[in-house]
């Protein structure tokens, strides 16, 4: 039995039993993947996968039990590697943070700067993407930490912690008629073309929910992942923007005005996610404590324990 066999089994499930994709992910050949799986089945005396000819079509009942053990072994192998690096170099390494564009641009800079001053030997790799990709990267070990507002609490193999609450603001050019609406109503917004985030990004769900609750259909003419892109098109007069409050800066965003909208849209909570059972280097705990001061190392360690093992 070897780790390549275990990785082949895990990746086969993750890639929907497509051996071509498994081979690409593991930098090997499709026949090589098939051989690794077959040799493991022969050694264990168990058929792990259901087959249709040479194609894998699913997991057998025994295979489902094998998969759980395989995943646990691979997590522990990664933990062992991390632990050995920890003892070899306490304050040297790379911290991989998967994060949405808005969090990377507006929420993280202060924490990253403070962390780098405290740990100059640690590189930070910011991996920006959508929340679903962030969750996937943390689950697969491609990222140590995930940060997003949407979606992270939906995965049972992730543990997530609240970092901070925030609301949306409405952004308009100077002199816009909505500036005279005090307080601003959802009905007022419904009469204007809107520019906001893509579905699944930066609290978009709460924006949509507010219009649904009011029985209104918003005229969303343009969407983007990035707050700066949204503000740019607002400045061109293409519509009214709805962005995260931390994405608007009165000094920097010349020619634009922000209108308070916390009474229109439900508040959002940015969360930080880790893979259950993962081993974190000491500096990772320091980073988390800087970005989410209310979360302690003891709390994180308790939450990271595999299901059924927490005290």
Each language-model region and where it sits:
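N-terminal short secondary-structure element
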Residues: 1-31, 36
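Central regulatory/effector-binding core of bacterial HTH transcription factors
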Residues: 92-154, 223-224
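Flexible hinge/capping segments at coil-to-helix
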Residues: 157-194
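Secondary-structure junction motif
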Residues: 178-179, 193-214, 280-289, 294-308
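Beta-alpha-beta core module
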Residues: 155-166, 228-277, 286
């Amino acid at each position: 039995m070897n780790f390549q066999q275990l990785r082949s089994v895990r990746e086969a499930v993750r890639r929907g039993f497509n051996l071509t994709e498994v081979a690409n992910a593991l930098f090997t050949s499709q026949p090589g993947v098939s051989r690794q799986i077959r040799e493991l089945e022969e050694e264990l005396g168990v058929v792990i996968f259901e087959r249709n000819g040479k194609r894998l079509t699913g997991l057998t009942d025994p295979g489902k039990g094998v998969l759980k053990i395989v995943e646990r072994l691979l997590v522990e192998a990664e933990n062992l590697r991390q632990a050995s690096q920890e003892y070899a170099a306490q304050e040297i390494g790379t911290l991989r943070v998967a994060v949405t564009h808005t969090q990377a641009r507006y929420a993280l800079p202060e924490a990253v700067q403070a962390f780098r001053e405290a740990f100059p030997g640690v590189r930070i790799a910011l991996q920006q993407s959508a929340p679903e990709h962030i969750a996937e990267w943390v689950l697969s070990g491609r990222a140590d930490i995930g940060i997003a507002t949407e979606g992270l609490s939906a995965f049972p193999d992730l543990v997530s912690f609240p970092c901070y609450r925030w609301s949306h603001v409405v952004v308009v050019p100077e002199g816009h008629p909505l500036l005279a609406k005090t307080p601003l109503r959802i009905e007022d917004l419904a009469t204007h073309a809107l520019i906001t985030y893509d579905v699944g990004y930066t609290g978009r769900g709460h924006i949509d929910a507010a219009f649904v609750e009011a029985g209104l259909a918003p005229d969303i003419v343009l969407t983007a992942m990035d707050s700066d892109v949204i503000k740019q098109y607002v400045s061109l007069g293409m519509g009214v923007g709805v962005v995260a409050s931390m994405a608007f800066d009165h000094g920097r965003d010349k020619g634009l005005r922000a209108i308070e909208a916390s009474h229109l849209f439900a508040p959002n909570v940015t969360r930080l996610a880790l893979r259950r059972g993962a081993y974190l280097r000491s500096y990772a705990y320091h980073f988390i404590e800087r970005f989410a001061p209310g979360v302690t190392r003891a709390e994180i360690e308790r939450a990271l324990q595999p299901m059924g093992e927490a005290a």
